[in-house]
Amino acid sequence: MRLFIAIRLSDEMRDALVHAQNELYDCGVRGRFTAEENLHLTLAFLGEVPDAEPVMDALSTLSFAPFELGLEGLGCFGDLWWAGLKESAALEALARKVRHALAERELPFDRKRFSPHITLIRNASGKLPGLQLRPASMTVSAVSLMRSDRGKHGMVYTELGAVEARR
C-alpha cells in the first residue's frame, strides 16, 4: 500500500485553498486540481509499504505540543503549483521528529529536504498570477498516517491512524 504521513487541514484552511483554486481557474490556469478532501500537508512520503503497523508504531513515539499553522503565498515547483505556509519552527521540528522516528526503525521514506507546501494543482499550465491567499490558520493537534489509492476519479486518501499532540 502507498503511504504518507500528513497533517490534515481544518475546514477554514481547505475553504481558503479551494477559493484560491477557483481564482486560479478563473485566471485561465488549467491542470489537475487537488480535490478539496485531498488537501493536506505531507510530512513524509513513504511510497509502497507492505504493512502499516510498523509505521504507526513509529508515529506512536512522537511527542509534540499543538501549534499554529497559517497559509502564506502561492508558488510552484515546475508544473506543480502550491500554497505556502508561514515559517514555523514547530512545524520544522515535527517534520524532523517524524522522519527521525521512521529512520530509527529503518522504514523507507523520501529523504528529500522538507519543503512545507500544500499541492493545489498538478500539471498546471498558464502563468502563476499574483493572487493573494485568503488568511487562514489552524491548530495542528494530530499527525495522520494516510493511504493513497487510485480511484475512478483520481486519488482517494484514507486515514489509517493518527497520533494526537502531547508534550
Where on the chain are the PLM-derived regions?
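Histidine-dependent nucleotide/RNA phosphoesterase domain, centered on the 2H-phosphoesterase fold
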Residues: 1-167
